[in-house]
Amino acid sequence: MSTHTTEPLREQVRARYADAALSVTHGERGSCGSGSCCANEAGFGEALYSGEERGELPDAATVASLGCGNPTAVADLREGDVVLDLGSGGGIDVILSAKRVGPTGVAYGLDMTDEMLALARKNAQEAGVANVHFLKGMIEQIPLPADSVDVVISNCVINLSVDKPAVLIEMARVLKPGGRVGVTDVVAEDRLTSEQRAERGSYVGCIAGALSKDEYVEGLQAAGFEDVSVEFTHEVADGMHGAIVKAVKR
């Protein structure tokens, strides 16, 4: 995509999720609209977390959850880990990660949306977690040093990026050697063309921009990862699935 094409898309994504954050802040549900990531409650949002996990969180963090999985459940988080959540939204996965890695670990959340960052910081304060840091920026240009992170997580966000190869390369850059990826995302079956994906949902709705399974595997391998796996977990549209994506930095 050219800059002429990508900037309007990025702004559409930013505006959609700013509206979602403001809805939660004003006491409404965290819906981002028909055809969005959270439109199908069976496949998106807070229902994908256990009751025990939801009990650890402020209501605003769970209501604001717009993801397609629970990356903290698949990322093999360990005491003392440094974790980075790409597109951290209202902070649900950052807060859970901070609790998992304990006081010797750190959980970073990166988001480009001021409204989501404000909501996430408020939620983290209410949850009583001190080992969190929320950063403003784009996931294509992560504002952290090389080899500084043990685990990268993300929840239904990479599909929204306008430059996915750059995201995967940045993930490899910030991870330490042997660092791990534990991502949940919408992934297309390989049989679907990009045009067919767009027929099934909008870009800001996490459908049209989704990578295929082969594209994900090949992209991660090209960025410097090994032990790459993409496992479909549930269908969110015809030929489109919530998926667990795992990899290790070479």
Label the predicted regions:
Residues 1-47:
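N-terminal auxiliary segments of SAM/dcSAM-dependent transferases
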Residues 39-82, 93-96, 100:
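Conserved alpha-helix/loop element of class I SAM-dependent methyltransferases that forms part
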Residues 68-70, 78-141:
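Class I SAM-dependent methyltransferase SAM/SAH-binding core
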Residues 83, 152-153:
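Hydrophobic beta-strand segment of the Class I
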Residues 102, 165-180:
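A short glycine-rich, Lys/Arg-flanked "PGG" loop and its adjoining helix->strand segment in the class I
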Residues 208-223:
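Short alpha-helix
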Residues 223-250:
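Core SAM-dependent methyltransferase catalytic element
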